[in-house]
Amino acid sequence: MKTLKYTALLILIVSQSIFSQVVEGNVDNLPVKEYTLTIREEVVNKAGVAVKGMTVNGSIPGPVLEFTEGEYAIIHVKNEMKEETSVHWHGIILPNFYDGVPYLSTPPIKPGQTLKYEFAIKQAGTYWYHSHTMLQEQSGVFGSIVIHPKKETLVYDKELVLMLSDWTNEKPMNVLRTLKRGSEWYQIKKGTATPLNRVIARGAVGAQLNFWRQRMVGADIADIYYPAFLINGKQSVEYPDFKPGEKVRVRVIDGAASTSFWMTFGGEDPVLVSADGHDVVPVVKNKTFIGIAEAYDFIVTIPQDGKIEYRITAQDGSGTASAFLGSGKILAAPVVPRPDKIGMMQKMAKMDMKMGAHALKYRPKKDERFKIKNEYGMQMDMSKDSKMKEMKMDDMKHKQMDMPKDSAKEGMEMDHSKMEGMKMEGMQEEAVKADSAKKDSVEGEMKMEGMDLFSEYNYDYLRSPVKTNYSADAPVKEILLNLTGNMQRYIWSMNGVPLAETDKIKIEGGQVTRITLNNLTMMHHPMHLHGHFFRVINKNGEYSPLKHTVNVPPMGNVTIEFYGSEYGDWFFHCHILYHMMSGMARVISYDTPRDTRMKGFPVSELVAETNRYYSWGMVDAASHFTALQLTASNLRNQFNVSMEYGWNKNLEGEVTYERYLHDYLRVFGGVNIENEKEDSFDTFKTTAVVGIRYLTPYLFNLDARIDNELRPRIALGRSVMVFPKFSVFGYYEYKLDLGLVNDLPVAKDYTSDTVWSAGVEYMFSKNVSVMGSYDNRFGAGGGLSVRF
């Protein structure tokens, strides 16, 4: 009887949801709740340095927006900055026009303008808002949303919102530029680099060679150095007003730009009661992984004799932050150890796991997703759900099937807050009595050596209190998205194709879209779908949870599915901001007419943001030579300028254009200029050059070229970090003249020229190094390398 009640209620809710998406405005005369958010640039100090940030109503994070289910939200967003901005309401079901993705669904908010967002509140739970313009979220444009249900289903006395974030004192665009140039500085700065001396000490040379063979420096699981991780804008924050015995609903949101966290609690183990705004069957769980953009609610009991420490630990162990609930002595949270990156490399080597799938493949229009999946990564099903294991993966050609007349009634998204008859109190108490050690254990852990490497990153502990599955008769469209990336050039994509080189993923209303997310990288990827909740298929089958964001662990896979009940275009992307801005995104489209209010705001502007040019340079100022290198690069195109001047007055310069065919191979052409006599600038020789540049296995940079005098040249270079901050490098070049154009000396069949150098470098900072080298042209010397 209860199941029939919930099914009928679900049908009613979704029918209303579809209608409300088409008809905007407060047509039902709901009570109005109104806010004004003002975004401006201000000087802030979050990590010991005063820098420019972006505030919402004068603070970072912005204010908590509170609503009650059944209200009508009107939010005025005022832009007092000199650049455009936007606000996305993360996890909120609302009309497409107000979703807040500039140039896709919503106009950008230009400097000095105010945009009014308005939508009915049809759900309850913990959510958040943030800018969707470039990297503004990293600078501070984010805040939380709390929506109270019409009738509470949980028992607690008070509540607390904890917004997690990461903070950099650099300009976010400079951070991305540093990543694009392939710098290892962030790994060095936070102590997570794996130089050769540590690899040798651990007996992991074979594992390191295996990574190098696959063109990977190491098991990098986080990109960026952060001087501070924050909870509600502070590295440590106290909440002493909670009294002993009180039950507190702690609403946690990971609003970080690129950091997922492990969460641990001191005192009595908490009860996890909600995920991404949806109630789940309460489970006692202390150590919990929260991916970027996810939200989890816990019920914690304030102890009689102390205060609870809530601690977050960055996924790579590079930092922590704490909040304290209550007063008295500290009940410390368990410490999460730093990941063993060298140990990870060793385990993966034993598994003979193939990595290095292209982030930028040769033919972006060719469908090779199954080939990619079969060739790279973990060749096994990591899911615990038998239904997932039985899925047929051979019919993914996006066939269109007839929609059964009654399937629309059963294939809809759930609004958990409407289920007022659901009695969670008893389940909550039962969970409190459960044994936390058993609840936290990893079920079904693989016994083969190395196979448990990422087994703790799963959602099996999340179970919906009601069935979430769709009608068995509903047509299903299956999509495979391999998550691919390249750390050297910092390009992130799906199926080897970044956003700028792909078309929209078209879906239809009235069908189930099932997406398998197959991660072929060493990074976590929290994937967020705008405007929808999807089922995360886990061991709970029909009771799999509903979420708006799902974390896909390194070399693992997750399957999600959702019922098509919306209209318009919706963004689907990795919520690591720097990955999204580097191409790991798609547009999910119902292929409906574009809103006329978006005229003048082409979606090409959004796409272009992921294919920008980034430029950088370096100057070597040494006693025996001086060199300059300048680079400007986007996804496929790169321009290079280099000049070198030796102590013997040998001057050489070169300008080239490169076209990347895929991650590791590019063709190039350009002009080389060199003074004909080493000690004279009277005459210069100019030659045209064409060739290929290739990143070989084991990370050697190969340059093979020929000039307009038909003289071939080959060059090979490599750098290796031996100790933290300390690297060795070498370069070899061989040029041959067979006399095809030039006259050779008497009795010579050919002439050749060899250039080689070797040296060491010590990094003082991100931008300055001291170096010493020997060059067979210039001799030995030393000096500074300055990067900009």
Question: Over which residues does each language-model region extend?
Answer:
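Bacterial Sec-dependent N-terminal signal peptides
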Residues: 1-22
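Histidine-centered copper-binding motifs that mark active-site loops
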Residues: 21-292, 298-299, 329-363, 373, ...
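Transmembrane beta-strand segments of Gram-negative outer membrane beta-barrel proteins
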Residues: 35-36, 481, 605-626, 634-643, ...
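Repeated loop/turn-to-beta-strand initiation elements of outer-membrane beta-barrel proteins
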Residues: 127, 570, 626, 635-640, ...
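Intrinsic, low-complexity N-terminal interaction/targeting segments
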Residues: 271-272, 277, 494, 503-504, ...
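Solvent-exposed loop/turn segments connecting transmembrane beta-strands
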Residues: 618-627, 643-653, 673-686, 696, ...
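Outer-membrane beta-barrel strand-turn architecture
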Residues: 633-636, 647, 659-665, 675, ...
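Outer-membrane beta-barrel "beta-signal"
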Residues: 690, 757-761, 777-788
